[in-house]
C-alpha cells in the first residue's frame, strides 16, 4: 500500500544543525531513530514528520545552504524487518538549484505494518 503525505513546513536549526520537516495534522504516537534520522509516527502508523540531525554533514552542504531548501521528498519503505528511507532535496546555492540525496536503513523495531510511504515539500 502506498501512502502520500504533504508536509507543509520545515525548520532548520542552524546552531544544532538539524532539519525538521513537519506539518501533518495527524496525532503523534511514537518515534524511531535511524542513526540520527528521526521518523515521527502517527496513530495511523504513517510517517508524519522527519528530523535529520547533523544535516549539513549528511547532505554535504554548508549550513547556510540549508536555510534555502526549495524541495524535499522522502520515500519510506517499511518491511517486516527494516525501514528504508530515500531522501532527495534541492537547495538554492548562488542562484542555482543543487540536488542532494541521502539514504538510511534501520530495523523496524516498533513493528510498523508493511507499507510504502512518501513525503513531499515544495517551498
Swiss-Prot record:
GO terms for biological process: purine ribonucleoside salvage. Disruption phenotype: Cells have increased resistance to the purine analog 8-aza-2,6-diaminopurine (8-ADP). This is Putative hypoxanthine phosphoribosyltransferase. GO terms for molecular function: transferase activity. It comes from Methanosarcina mazei (strain ATCC BAA-159 / DSM 3647 / Goe1 / Go1 / JCM 11833 / OCM 88) (Methanosarcina frisia). Keywords: Purine salvage, Transferase. It is an enzyme of class 2 (transferase). Transmembrane segments: none annotated.
Amino acid at each position: 500500500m502506498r501512502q502520500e503525505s504533504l508536509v507543509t513546513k520545515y525548520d532548520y536549526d542552524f546552531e544544532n544543525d538539524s532539519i525538521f520537516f513537519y506539518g501533518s495534522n495527524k496525532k503523534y504516537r511514537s518515534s524511531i531513530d535511524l542513526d540520527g534520522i528521526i521518523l515521527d509516527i502517527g496513530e495511523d502508523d504513517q510517517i508524519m514528520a522527519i528530523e535529520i540531525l547533523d544535516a549539513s554533514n549528511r547532505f554535504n552542504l554548508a549550513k547556510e545552504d540549508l536555510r534555502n531548501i526549495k524541495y524535499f521528498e522522502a520515500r519510506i519503505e517499511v518491511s517486516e524487518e527494516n525501514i528504508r528511507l530515500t531522501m532527495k532535496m534541492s537547495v538554492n546555492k548562488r542562484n542555482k538549484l543543487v540536488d542532494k540525496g541521502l539514504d538510511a536503513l534501520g530495523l523496524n523495531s516498533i513493528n510498523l505494518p508493511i507499507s510504502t510511504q512518501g513525503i513531499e515539500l515544495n517551498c
